[in-house]
Amino acid sequence: MYHSRWKNSHEVAGFSYGERLYKNVIKINFEKYLTKEKLSYSQKVIRIYEKYYPEIVEEIKGFAAGQKSDFEKVFAFLAGMYVFTYDTQCSMVAVSNKNGIFFARNSDFLTKIEKLADSVLYKLDKGFHLLGIQQLW
């Protein structure tokens, strides 16, 4: 299991992660997973992301730059990841109140892909810190 450390700003953290994957010959072919429907969806929701969660947009821009990929394609892939997935048992919840917007999700973890998993320490300049598990590409 890999242990990544996300730090600094959202954009810098995203760039560092995307670049680290790229330098380790993990260049994600986002276009392979896109459809016209997913691209259309992402173009509609980008304004919502920019209004309510601009930090994630900055993080995705950084990640796309680190991967040497087009932001629009990376965003379309990520924004539609759970919207257009029909056969998983994952769950998501989001809550908004005077303290901010809180989003959590679980992605079912298969132990057979443990070597492709990342234990993430997410400690950016602003916001809450977290430790979580994610599947690598």
Question: What would you call each of these model-derived segments?
Answer:
Residues 1-137:
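N-terminal mature-domain region immediately after signal-peptide cleavage
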